[in-house]
Regions:
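Conserved glycine(s) of the Walker
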Residues: 15
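Glycine-rich phosphate-binding loop used to anchor ATP phosphates in small-molecule kinases
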Residues: 58-102
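Conserved substrate/cofactor phosphate-moiety recognition/catalytic segment
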Residues: 18-71
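C-terminal accessory "lid"/substrate-recognition subdomains
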Residues: 182-193
C-alpha cells in the first residue's frame, strides 16, 4: 500500500487551491499542504522574522516540518498545493521528499492561458497577506512569474517526470482529473475492510 502525493504546478490564480480543496473533499484520508497558509501565518504572527529578500527560509522550514510530520506520524495522502514551477524544485520533491518506492507521485499541471489569469487577478478578492517584499498585488506576482519563464529552471512538467501527469487547461478538466486521482487512490492504497 502506497500513499499518494499530488503536487500542483501552475501560476498564481490558475486554480491550484480550488482544485486542492475539491480533491481533499473527494479523496478520503488526505490533507492539503499549501505554503500560502504558512506565509499568511508568518506575516500575521511573526512578521519581524520574515526575511525581506533572498530565500524564504522560515516559510520553507515551516512547510518542511509540516510535511515531515505528516509523513512520519500519519497515513494521509498529501496534496502539495504550491506553484512548483521550478524543475529543480520538483525534482527535489519527487526524488528526495517523496521517493517512488514509498509514494505514488502525481503532478497536476495547470496550463491556463495567460489572458484568463490576468482576468482572474484583476477580479481577485484574495488576501495579499501572503506577500513578502515589495509586492502589492497578484498582478505583480503574475508579471514576475511571466518574467521567470525566461529562466531555464522554470519549465512545464513532462511525461515521466512523476508516476502520473495530468494537465488542466480549463475548469472543465478539473472534475475528470479529480475522479482519476480518486481512482488511483483506490487502486494503489485500498481502504482496509
Amino acid at each position: 500500500m502506497k500513499r499518494l502525493v499530488i503536487i500542483t504546478v501552475g501560476k498564481t490564480h490558475s486554480g491550484k487551491t480550488t482544485f486542492a480543496k475539491e480533491l481533499e473533499k473527494e479523496l478520503p484520508n488526505s490533507f492539503i499542504m499549501d505554503q500560502d497558509n504558512q506565509a499568511e501565518f508568518i506575516n500575521t504572527h511573526y512578521e519581524k522574522l520574515q526575511p525581506t529578500e533572498g530565500s524564504n527560509i522560515l516559510k520553507h522550514g515551516l512547510s518542511k516540518f509540516i510535511v515531515d510530520y505528516a509523513k512520519e506520524h500519519t497515513n494521509l495522502h498529501l496534496i502539495i498545493c504550491n506553484s512548483n514551477r521550478s524543475k529543480n524544485g520538483r525534482f527535489y520533491l519527487l526524488n528526495e521528499v517523496f521517493p517512488q518506492n514509498e509514494y505514488i507521485r502525481i503532478l497536476v499541471h495547470f496550463a491556463i492561458p495567460d489572458d484568463v489569469l490576468y482576468e482572474r487577478v484583476g477580479l481577485s478578492k484574495r488576501s495579499t497577506n501572503i506577500f513578502r517584499g515589495n509586492y502589492s498585488s497578484f498582478k505583480e506576482v503574475l508579471h514576475r512569474q511571466q518574467v521567470k519563464l525566461l529562466h531555464e529552471d522554470v519549465v512545464d512538467p513532462i511525461e515521466n517526470g512523476a508516476d502520473y501527469l495530468f494537465v488542466i487547461r480549463n475548469s472543465k478538466d478539473v472534475n475528470s482529473t479529480i475522479l482519476k486521482i480518486v481512482h488511483l487512490a483506490k487502486e494503489f492504497s485500498p481502504t482496509p475492510k
